[in-house]
Amino acid sequence: MGLLECCARCLIGAPFASLVATGLCFFGVALFCGCGHEALTGTEQLIETYFSKNYQDYEYLIDVIHAFQYVIYGTASFFFLYGALLLAEGFYTTGAVRQIFGDYRTTICGKGLSATVTGGPKGRGARGPQRAHSLQRVCQCLGKWLGHPDKFVGITYVLTIVWLLAFACSAVPVYIYFNTWTTCQSIAFPTKTTASIGTLCADARMYGVLPWNAFPGKVCGSNLLSICKTSEFQMTFHLFIAAFVGAAATLVSLLTFMIAATYNFAVLKLMGRGTKF
């Protein structure tokens, strides 16, 4: 078998939707977690520097920010593992379909995973059962754990609902920073508004970031414009936008996983057709 033919057969058996969704998931989670972590740090610095001089005013906010940062660490680890498992599930379903319908030209891992459902080749002969390849044995063990694609569909569905909440929450800081940036634009170009520059403010207390008794709690006029021109504000704003984009990419990947797994499972269990994802 030539190299090109071997590569072509490998590509034919690859679950392309799962591969794309896995790459999108890793990219989105990395963007969301990395940029979100740094954006929270930047927010903490902005609050400490410009919006409150009393540590007790933002002590609770700092605790919340640190808690979210720890959650980000766990989220990155979880999605790295779960994305890999969903990719394995894609190979699993593909291998099972091809095994059931007589196409044995799958990868070693695909055969090992599919063997847990189909029973696989037993290798009977004079020497008894053949000795399995080490990688195939590992995949068979993994396949026993992945042998319930319907449960993976359910877990992914629940995870998608949960991530919808995370996606919505990631839009909140973007909204706050965008409003602040819009106010700064009105200050920089006073002809666009009829309000007095001194009355144009960004109030952190209004969004619940600081308690109402925090002082000063808000920044107005030219002082606010100078904050918007700092690299800290601009970087934090763009980091939150990047985190929002990462959350959106992760949501798309989860939807792709769920649709592909649902369709694949239906084909495998109900329709009996060798379609793969």
Curated annotation (Swiss-Prot):
Membrane-traversing stretches: 11-36, 60-88, 152-178, 239-268
Pfam families the record matches: Myelin_PLP (PF01275)
Membrane topology, Extracellular segments: 37-59, 179-238
Superkingdom of origin: Eukaryota
Lipidation (S-palmitoyl cysteine): 6-7, 10, 109, 139, 141
PROSITE patterns in the record: MYELIN_PLP_1, MYELIN_PLP_2
Annotated protein name in UniProt: Myelin proteolipid protein
Organism this protein belongs to: Gallus gallus (Chicken)
